[in-house]
């Protein structure tokens, strides 16, 4: 909802006080949702008509009702996933504030450098309510992990959309909702249709093929793995592989021992884009010398200079496609993937991606 000048002043006055109280509240009641949760994706949207012509009303992914006077023209994105989505949906110019550490995201430099000049309002752990209020956005978009801040912002007169794109389905729903909120439904449909079409295409290409045993390691250590409840597990399955860590409990990176990794006996090991270690670290670890993937040299690192394709982001479908080309190059050659990835960025991000950045 757009707020008037008087409400802006009220927001600024209250925000400083609310920031302190909210921080205390968040420590006691912070949500347990994690970035890898495979929770149910909710959310629906519709444009109201009749007596409320032009009103955009929808239910967000936390089951909350959101109502805008019209398509949002100014947006604060508190989450890199939704900032990425704004770029892909062609509304990056409407983002007036975003998450911190924006300069560490290569895609901002490549596709939307103006974002680097925008105010940064918070992290996945805390949000600067006063900074958000000062920007007076039509819409604030935040991950479920920050949902404690939603009520505070609404009390200040702002509309808040909570998202949870932690599954393939949840990501598609998030894109549809953000497209609806910004009045770019056709663009969102184009993006989600591409996503679904490529999932189907990868499934068809790998149908009837052997499904290699895959170990997808975490960012901080290769002695962490993705349980079945994580988005990363669906990436492996969608690429025609079998997640050897699927039986682990939890919805976030699970710590494992050397003995456990050896018992899983993966034929392929995948290192994510944000890893703090290298292929050479794994190949050179004497405690993994008997691992099938190490013995055959089948340890691959996802490209690190573009986006985090192992994450639930608009380009996340490229993670499934990249892995398909690694696991099943006989049916989907790596050169074909490179061409597809370049076409994706040209179509949805508006720039020609340097093919040398696409590695394995």
Give the residues covered by each predicted segment:
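N-terminal low-complexity, Pro/Thr/Ser-rich intrinsically disordered segments
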Residues: 37-69
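Proline-aspartate-enriched helix->loop->beta-strand connector
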Residues: 121-124, 129-142, 158, 257-273
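Alpha-helical, coiled-coil/dimerization segments enriched in small aliphatic residues
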Residues: 225-253, 257
